[in-house]
Amino acid sequence: MNTPKLISYIFETHQEAEEATKLLGKSGFDVKKISIIGKGYHSEEHPVGFYTTSDKIKSWGSTGAFWGGLWGVLFLPAVFFMPGFGLVAMAGPFTSVLVSALEGAVVVGGLSALGAALSQVGISKNEVIKYEVAIKADQFVMLIHGVTEDCEKVDLILKKFRDNKSQYLV
């Protein structure tokens, strides 16, 4: 039975996250099931600028090409200012979960808005903390939204791409 699942990866660099996204797309995986979360800049003193035109977001700065490239492939691009994180950029289905959490003023046991949204998709508090730390350290979190079959396919593809750093979440 194909039950809903979420698989997650943490990438050290934006290049690694971009390569993984491209590899999944070339392998026939539906990239609309991918969410990427990370900072849009390298320091709080030098933020990246963003503006929207239609459904596209344009960006500048050291990671601007990365986000611009992903926003051409993934859907629901967005940028948020989040206390404790600064500017956080994301794309994919998770964006709507975060917007819902922000609109509903969801507070979950002292977690940030990002943490509350992550917990809403079934991620444990310990994993939420791990992802928040990764994002604050300029790493990138990839979430794959799908069913068991999707997650198994992605895991096989990305295991070939790099060491196994994935973890299934229920």
Residue ranges and their predicted role:
Residues 2-53, 105-170:
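Cytosol/matrix-facing juxtamembrane amphipathic
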Residues 53-128:
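Small-residue-rich hydrophobic membrane-insertion segments
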